[in-house]
């Protein structure tokens, strides 16, 4: 069951791109829940939460920039601290994930 869902997620090209990095699936989960819960977790905090196969910080930021350029994620100013930038998955991608996982948003 888990693997069926995982493979279905990987068929989505945006998710496949995120998961192209060793830490990608973990990053996807983090940003998904940050988006879903409207969490005030900044880019640096997101990086620090990665536990497995973490890249160097500059490579991580370059990957975030690439995902943003492709429209997969977006950056938003934190509602609590103007100097903090939070990451969000695109609404379209959130809908695709929720549909595959059969989650009501």
Language-model segments: residues:
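Short alpha-helical segments that sit at the start of domains
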Residues: 2-30
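Short amphipathic alpha-helical interaction segments
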Residues: 53-69
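Short acidic, hydrophobic short linear motifs in intrinsically disordered regions
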Residues: 37-50
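Short, cationic-aromatic polyanion-contact patches
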Residues: 78-101
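Short amphipathic alpha-helical elements of helix-turn-helix/winged-helix folds
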Residues: 30-37
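Amphipathic alpha-helical dimerization/coiled-coil segments
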Residues: 11, 98-105
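A short, conserved structural fragment
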Residues: 68-78
């Amino acid at each position: 069951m888990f693997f069926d869902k995982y493979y279905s997620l990987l068929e989505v090209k945006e998710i496949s791109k995120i998961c192209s990095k060793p830490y990608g699936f973990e990053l996807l989960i983090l940003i998904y829940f940050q988006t879903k819960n409207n969490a005030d977790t900044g880019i640096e905090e997101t990086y620090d939460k990665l536990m497995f196969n973490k890249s160097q910080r500059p490579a991580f930021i370059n990957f975030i920039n690439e995902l943003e350029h492709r429209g997969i994620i977006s950056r938003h100013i934190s509602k609590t601290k103007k100097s903090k930038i939070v990451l969000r998955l695109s609404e379209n991608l959130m809908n695709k994930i929720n549909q595959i996982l059969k989650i009501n948003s």
